């Protein structure tokens, strides 16, 4: 007996590699990020496909090409950052591309966020096609009010990134997504939860029989 444990490789369901965002690109690509994950004992990662105007297949092809330098196992979620009738009809095709999850945002107005009605419809479509909805939960409208106020006051140091994104907004949005999930009878996964209040919202929703995870 060696006193050591044999453990399976970890699965990280939320990474951002080769990601263009706000005029820059994330520090790791699909090789360096995978290498770092492997050193930490993670052998599978799940990244997010950025939805381009040309549709799902075009977008997935871009990210599959970038992942050709992969060092470990990987898969993708789809960022649903646009929504219209064409996109609604195409969502089921993602299953044939190996993507079974849709991520929506309640923040980043005018960039990543879609409106609540579109989120609700996407949840219904996901439900009907055996897919899982995921949500980045914050209050985008409040954030978009606080950021200009902070900039006008000269508050540009790092702590104001947090101060312009109040934690209660994440709590409120988590409850909102749980309510939509109950109404749609669809499962939802709340990503990167930070607030105790979000856990409270999940507990409340689960007690009501909602399939909500975080």
Label every model-predicted segment.
Residues 4-69, 86:
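Metal-associated gating/positioning segment near the N- to mid-region
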Residues 17-20, 47-49, 74-76, 106-108, ...:
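A short, structure-level motif marking secondary-structure boundaries and short turns
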Residues 22, 51, 79, 193-194:
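Structured loop/turn residues at secondary-structure junctions
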């Amino acid at each position: 007996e060696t006193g050591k444990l044999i453990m399976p490789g970890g699965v990280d369901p939320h990474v951002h590699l080769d990601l263009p965002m706000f005029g820059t690109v994330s520090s790791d690509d699909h090789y360096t990020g995978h290498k770092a994950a492997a050193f930490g004992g993670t052998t599978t990662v799940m990244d997010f496909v950025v939805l381009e105007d040309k549709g799902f297949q075009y977008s997935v092809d871009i990210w599959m090409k970038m992942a050709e330098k992969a060092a470990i196992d990987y898969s993708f979620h789809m960022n649903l950052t646009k929504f219209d009738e064409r996109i609604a009809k195409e969502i089921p095709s993602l299953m044939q591309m190996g993507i079974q999850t849709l991520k929506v945002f309640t923040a980043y107005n005018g960039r990543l966020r879609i409106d609540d009605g579109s989120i609700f419809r996407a949840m219904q479509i996901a439900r009907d096609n055996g897919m899982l909805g995921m949500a980045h939960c914050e209050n985008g409208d409040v954030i978009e009010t606080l950021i200009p106020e902070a900039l006008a006051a000269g508050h540009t140091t790092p702590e104001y990134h947090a101060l312009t994104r109040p934690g209660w907004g994440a709590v409120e949005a988590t409850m909102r997504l749980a309510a939509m999930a109950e109404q749609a009878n669809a499962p939802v996964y709340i990503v990167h939860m930070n607030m105790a209040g979000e856990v409270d919202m999940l507990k409340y929703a689960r007690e009501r029989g909602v399939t909500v995870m975080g």
